[in-house]
């Protein structure tokens, strides 16, 4: 798949097999088959943030609706900004950093301070693709130093007088308000951000958006009628929040050691991403598709495929409880081969 006009998280990834493997159906389960309470506790809701409340307030409402102890959103939106606010629940909040650092897409209404030739507007916008320099706004939670951020693509959707509607895919931490200001300067007419909506955040898109009202209704249906179906629709397994990361698939016998904080050795791997780079953040999965941990790759794909020993990855955040899988069982007759 071409990477033009796409976020890094949208580039297709493929797995390569290192060795055959078996998984025991007695231990663990596919993420979508978790009991409902565990499903909620290890879930993520792709909330459609309305204009008005802060991102923190929206996350707090999600927490209150579902009765979970913790809820964390993946990247703040200003109060007036709408759109995607993926909110991880309970134990899934450990995966927030992986999603927060992923690329984002926005649709923006730029208001120029005077009308400019449409052809020139399109040309100048295109010149902002690639690395750009930005200084965080005065009212910012981060230190005000010049930073480099990557603009993956800009597509002008509509121009009417002084109004410009454009779609932009960018690196996490890009200030779209500052981008609008800089485009206005480059055009020589000035400009400012009039309105903004986030349309993609890592692997999440508008197709799976859920309103707070829909979330509340789904929870009530389950509590009052015992119907889990709508709740399972609006809440997605936490695994969907890291689907953009390179994957390493573990043997069942290696899972518990990683859950206890041990590094992942090469013999514990059955398959992995075809383009894993040393030092890259990777997601460790079971053969059933369960997220075990986020880890730093200590070898690249080629090195892992050639090696028979050594440390392949070091866990950074463990999301699966120790004891979910037994320690080093080998009874293949009780297993399902994959």
Swiss-Prot record:
PUA domain residues: 245-320
* Residues annotated as the enzyme's active site: 78 (nucleophile)
Q: Which reaction does it catalyse?
A: uridine(55) in tRNA = pseudouridine(55) in tRNA
Q: Which InterPro entries does the entry mention?
A: Dyskerin-like, PsdUridine_synth_cat_dom_sf, PsdUridine_synth_N, PUA, PUA-like_sf, PUA_sf, tRNA_PsdUridine_synth_B_fam, TruB_arch
The record's Pfam families line, in alphabetical order, gives: DKCLD, PUA, TruB_C_2, TruB_N
Q: Which GO terms describe its biological process?
A: box H/ACA sno(s)RNA 3'-end processing; mRNA pseudouridine synthesis; rRNA pseudouridine synthesis; snRNA pseudouridine synthesis; tRNA pseudouridine synthesis
This protein's source sits in the domain of life called: Archaea
Which intervals of the chain form a coiled coil? none
Q: Which UniProt keywords apply?
A: Isomerase, tRNA processing
- What EC number(s) does its UniProt record assign? 5.4.99.25
Gene Ontology molecular functions: pseudouridine synthase activity; RNA binding; tRNA pseudouridine(55) synthase activity
Give the similarity note: Belongs to the pseudouridine synthase TruB family. Type 2 subfamily.
In UniProt terms, what function does this protein have? Answer: Could be responsible for synthesis of pseudouridine from uracil-55 in the psi GC loop of transfer RNAs.
Q: What is this protein called?
A: Probable tRNA pseudouridine synthase B
Q: What is the lineage of its organism?
A: Archaea, Methanobacteriati, Methanobacteriota, Stenosarchaea group, Methanomicrobia
